[in-house]
Amino acid sequence: MTERFNDRLADVIRRPLITEKATSALEQNQYTFEVDHRAAKPDIKAAVEQLFDVRVVGISTMNPPRRSRRVGRFTGKRAQVKKAIVRLAEGNTIQLFPES
């Protein structure tokens, strides 16, 4: 784990991503999260294991380039987004949707 997130692992994971592709990946025990763009794989693994009390088997990350956005005559850039697909060990699950 890098020194950047030693004392605040909760800052590594921003939110779970709920898309059609991410929802279908839940069947293979893979969860998709938006993470801090400076986070490395050991940071993400430590954060998921500590916050959700599960065992992580593998992590895939993607850091796509920022895209330009235009509103009227003004142009800008979208926020930097890094996604992580976390594969859990068999028998481990993360409760993303609360039971009612």
From Swiss-Prot:
Entry-linked PROSITE patterns: RIBOSOMAL_L23
GO biological process terms, semicolon-separated: translation
Highest taxon above the source species: Bacteria
InterPro entries: Nucleotide-bd_a/b_plait_sf (IPR012677), Ribosomal_uL23-like (IPR013025), Ribosomal_uL23/eL15/eS24_sf (IPR012678), Ribosomal_uL23_CS (IPR001014)
GO MF term list: rRNA binding; structural constituent of ribosome
Subunit architecture: Part of the 50S ribosomal subunit. Contacts protein L29, and trigger factor when it is bound to the ribosome.
Family as reported in the entry's similarity comment: Belongs to the universal ribosomal protein uL23 family.
Protein name: Large ribosomal subunit protein uL23
